[in-house]
Amino acid sequence: MRYVSNLPHAVKEEEHVVVPARDGTRLSARVWRPVSSDTEPVPGVLEYIPYRKRDLSAVRDSIHHPYLAGHGYACVRVDLRGTGESEGVLADEYLEQEQTDAEDVLAWLAEQPWCDGNTGMMGISWGAFAALQTAARRPPSLRAVVLASFTDDRYADDMHYMGGALLSDNLAEAGTMFAYATCPPDPALVGERWRDMWHERMENTRPWILNWLRHQRRDDYWRHASVCEDYSAVQVPVLASSGWADGYSNAVTRVLEHLDVPRKGLVGPWSHKYPHLGEPGPAIGYLQEVVRWWDHWLKGVDNGVMDGPMLQAWMQDSVPPSTSYEERPGRWVGEPSWPSPHITPVSRALLRHRIAATGPAPTAGEPMTVQSPLSVGQFAGKWASYNAPPDLPYDQREEDGGSLVFDTEPLTEPVEILGSPSVELDLTVSEPVATVAARISDVAPDGSATRVTYGVLNLTHRAGTGEPELLEPGRRYRATVQLNGVAQAFPPGHRIRLSLSTSYWPLVWPAPRPARLSVYEGTSTLTLPVRPTAEPDELPQQPFGEPEGCPPLASTQVTAPEERWEVRRDLIGYRSALEIVKDRGTVRIDDIGLDTGLRAEERYTATADDFTSVAGETAWTMRFTRDDWDVRVETRTRMRCSEEEFHVDATLDGYEGGRRVFSRTWNETVPRDAL
């Protein structure tokens, strides 16, 4: 990244500005704005997230907010109620209270003497969710939004559930927010109230996973703040982006298809990162694109930002399998609209061990049967990759050993796909609850298999309504597995492989009992969204500038970070474990003399093929120290199951000066609901 300090406007920063909510709660904002805005008001841009602007998100914030301010915008970074230095308690994600607060912040922003009354919202992940959800409420000052790595569907396309199956990232994210929601504010900003605010948070926070587990089907809990329930509610222009390695790769094309506002989409090779920080690379000059977006929609500049294709996507070239990549080779392609007139769905029948060169047969052939071991999925990587070595999927050959596998013949010419593949299965199963995972891989001539995309379906959710229906063992059903969207080029000499398995642990929590899946050949099909290789890309080879931003906030790495991802197998007790460590080490924020430490551990275990032996555990430690101030929060969440129930054990401990000042435990049971 190129760091720039010479910007069109000199920038002033206010670290702690109080923003009143309508109920009297005081939210905390950090503001960057042009010095000239004292006399020449500018549009305001809000980023609204729970990740602690004072410390844990301070370095990232310092790259893009001063940059945008230097281009003529008042940028406001607000900690959600109950996080950072904002008062109150954060009880869950995307609550009505959160959105009401967002409306209050925008109203406050529009009324400031240095703001001209026009506002935008931007963010990645939670911040993008917040921007899209707030846009659907139509606050009067909001003119446009910028979204990165987001969803419009909280039930079907977030880290909780996928195809009606429970994702283990549900546990991981719950552990993350259990820790963030119980950290204290900094007394340097809030004074002696810090301790009371901290204890209020700890006293009133429950493990978020309990609520998420109690809503296992698409109900009003998930419908709330899912913009897909009413796309027409969004009436402002949308710039949407994500990455093919991210868990949130699908929403960009959905909002392009369903919104009826000016909109642009951008999907790169990235994991869960802003595009200017994108990994795997190439990262792009995203902030320059954001400035163009704001210039047009907040300032009325006629700069051609809406010219060119509606969707710009990185067409990924073939690569050997790896758990991380610095760069993904490929090229940018453009589509004039979405769905694109250039994309043709091509269906091919599944035959024994192969993908036919023709469409489905009129009658079914013999069934092909699989009952996968629990080990299938140990090399699946993370649902939402951060490109943190090694959280991308590894060589799929070991996974394929426990799967039904279908290959094309070696390709004689290149094949490119852009969009969401699907698999339609003519099937029977042996259990009333069963899961099927479908994977597409790029198989090289040496046999190595790189996963391209995947999808999961809890077959009780085959109707796609969010209301499960138990299966009748032995009965024939038709079910469609939707795979994640992707842009991928398969070269000549390679094969396209489809793999089907009945487990995908620990990415997906397994069904209550092992299930035997039978798939009928000829009447089961794979459909690929094929983009003709002769189609013009509609884009120059390098349509984006070099990534740039402001120099990051000065910080010092006091102790070394640690990243580990290990699969362990005990061949005596037939136990397996996936163990993950993400430790940022101790980082000192130089300007304020604050040391921060964050360590997260995840562990997923199973014994043999006992589907009720699986367990997941997360442990978080977050520490903040300065002079004689030393506090830390430790959380631990463990999830187990029987055939009928989930069991959750959780602990929360708060320490001040090395002494434990708060402790609470939870031991609760949640019934399984066709899951």
In which residue ranges do the predicted regions lie?
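N-terminal cap/lid segment of alpha/beta-hydrolase-fold proteins
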Residues: 2-38, 407, 411-413, 426, ...
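Cap/lid segment of the alpha/beta-hydrolase catalytic domain
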Residues: 35-110, 159-160, 432, 438-446, ...
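Accessory cap/linker subdomain of secreted extracellular hydrolases
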Residues: 61-62, 70, 133-233
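Alpha/beta-hydrolase fold nucleophile elbow
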Residues: 113-125
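Glycine-rich nucleophile elbow surrounding the catalytic serine of serine-hydrolase chemistry
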Residues: 124-133
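Short beta-strand/loop motif that positions the catalytic acidic residue
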Residues: 234, 240-242
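Active-site-adjacent alpha-helix of alpha/beta-hydrolase-fold enzymes
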Residues: 250-263
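C-terminal, loop-rich substrate-recognition/catalytic regions characterized by aromatic stacking residues
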Residues: 276, 280-653, 659-675
